[in-house]
Swiss-Prot record:
Molecular function in Gene Ontology: allantoinase activity; dihydroorotase activity; zinc ion binding
Positions that bind Zn(2+) 2: D150, H177, H230
Gene name in the database record: pyrC
Annotated NCBIfam families: PRK09357.1-4, pyrC_multi
UniProt-listed Pfam families: Amidohydro_1
Active site positions, chain numbering: D303
Residues annotated as binding Zn(2+) 1: H59, H61, D150, D303
Residues reported to bind substrate: H61, F62, R63, N93, N276, H307
InterPro entries, per the entry: Amidohydro-rel, DHOase, DHOase/Allantoinase_Hydrolase, Dihydroorotase_CS, Metal-dep_hydrolase_composite, Metal_Hydrolase
Chain ranges passing through the membrane: none
Cofactor binding note of this UniProt entry: Binds 2 Zn(2+) ions per subunit.
Keywords linked to the UniProt accession: Hydrolase, Metal-binding, Pyrimidine biosynthesis, Zinc
Protein name: Dihydroorotase
Gene Ontology biological process terms, A to Z: 'de novo' UMP biosynthetic process; purine nucleobase catabolic process
């Protein structure tokens, strides 16, 4: 038995927000009450700390199989636990891609060894070829939770429509990375800073929002659910809002880096601030925050994208891979740039990091209730934390190293077991 005493228990599903005790047994929460005494229980004193549902991240890259010099499922799970996450959804851009049942089963076998809940999508098209759909039905039956070709946009509108129709038939959805290659230059650099500082053609806004406009309208026509990944532009928020207004089933996520920083970070942090989609303008940063506030964007997801230090530290920054490690800074960025900044309440932040992402996939997660799962994060919301280069992840490609942020994870509990302790 595990007894958590005197914490501020916050549950976005029920709205519970009060100081009370939580008793855990056999992987479940068995009691939540103002005062619990339990002889012989292991006790955590959570005085002054928030007791929240375990965080849920629906967009991570754990690089297994094929790229385990960057990360693997084990180190990814350790990074997740250190960041307060108890459930994650891996993307399928591995080598080989997760496009068939055999590869999926091998990945899920590896994931099952971890102490947190590690789930995965499968690809929409075979080996990311953009032309032939995978066997959605067989992959779902084998344990895939959804479908995404994340990392590679789907150029064929015919394939997008077919994928949506198939997903709808099977009561699932597809998640899309929206950057039209035909409208883009060098990825990872927003068009403004690319032109003015790096003297190259960069990643344009229109490449994101034009492709997104196409896809949300196909979703509208097919009555299928589409999930937009890591949107970054002011116009993209408007596109999602427009589609939702028409009655289309469109959901969207934003990554913490896009509500925290702008393209200027490239000048101080170099390749660690290079990502797809790129960091944009202050007007875009403000717009995605407004999208979170209005409910147009319902999910915060990290796009945790670890890379080896040698890959990032190349002489020509345009040759460096895009992406940043994100699991261990996500909560702190939300607390710093949304809650402390007065943009969202703590409960609203938690909703977008727990209940909403869990609900999207119908996971039994993201809430605190008696008889519910004992997936719990305990953190100090007010503590200052200097981000250093020591991560549980294999990778340290974070542009936030050296910055002081709010919030410190104290304990992560998954299935009733302490999986991380600061």
């Amino acid at each position: 038995m595990l007894l958590i005493k005197n914490g501020r228990v916050m549950d976005p599903k029920s709205g519970l927000d009060q100081v009370c005790d939580v008793l855990v047994q056999d992987g479940k929460i068995i009691k939540i009450a103002p005062e619990i005494t339990e002889e012989g229980a292991e006790t955590i004193d959570a005085t002054g700390h928030v007791v929240a549902p375990g965080l849920v991240d629906i967009h991570v890259h754990f690089r297994e199989p094929g790229q385990t010099h960057k990360e693997d499922i084990h180190t990814g799970a350790l990074a997740a636990a250190a960041g307060g996450f108890t459930t994650v959804v891996m993307m399928a851009n591995t080598s080989p891609t997760i496009s068939d049942v055999e590869t999926l089963q091998a990945v899920l076998q590896s994931a099952a060894k971890e102490k947190i809940n590690v789930k995965t999508v499968a690809t929409i098209t075979k080996n990311f070829n953009g032309k032939n759909l995978t066997d959605f039905k067989a992959l779902l039956e084998a344990g895939a939770v959804g479908f995404s070709d994340d990392g590679i946009p789907l150029e064929s509108s015919k394939i997008v429509k077919e994928a949506m129709e198939e997903a709808k038939k099977l009561n699932t959805f597809i998640s899309l990375h929206e950057e039209d290659p035909g409208l883009n230059g060098v990825l990872g650099f927003n068009e403004n800073i690319a032109r003015e500082h790096f003297h190259i053609c960069g990643a344009t806004g229109v490449a994101e929002y034009a492709m997104m406009a196409r896809d949300v309208m196909i979703a509208y026509a097919t009555k299928a659910h589409v999930h937009i990944q890591h949107l970054s532009k002011e116009e993209s928020v408007k596109v999602v809002e427009f589609a939702q207004g028409l009655g289309a089933e469109v959901t969207a996520e934003v990554a913490p880096q896009h509500f925290s920083k702008t393209e200027a970070l490239l000048l101080t942090q170099g390749s660690n601030a290079k990502m797809n989609p790129p960091l944009r303008l202050e007007s875009d940063r403000r717009a995605v925050i407004e999208g979170l506030k209005s409910g147009v964007i319902t999910v915060i997801a990290t796009d945790h994208a670890p890379h080896h230090v040698d890959e990032k530290n190349v002489e020509d920054i345009t040759k460096a891979p895009s992406g940043m490690t994100g699991l261990e800074t996500s909560l702190s960025l939300g607390l710093t740039y949304l809650v402390e900044a007065g943009e969202l309440s703590l409960m609203e932040l938690l909703e977008k990091m727990t209940y909403n992402p869990a609900k999207l996939y119908n996971f039994e997660a993201g809430y605190l209730a008696e008889n519910g799962p004992a997936d719990i994060t305990i953190f100090d919301a007010k503590a200052d934390r200097l981000v250093d280069s020591h991560f549980a992840s294999k990778a340290a490609n974070s542009p936030f190293i050296g910055e002081t942020l709010k919030g410190q994870v104290k304990y992560t509990i998954c299935k009733g077991q302490i999986v991380y302790q600061a």
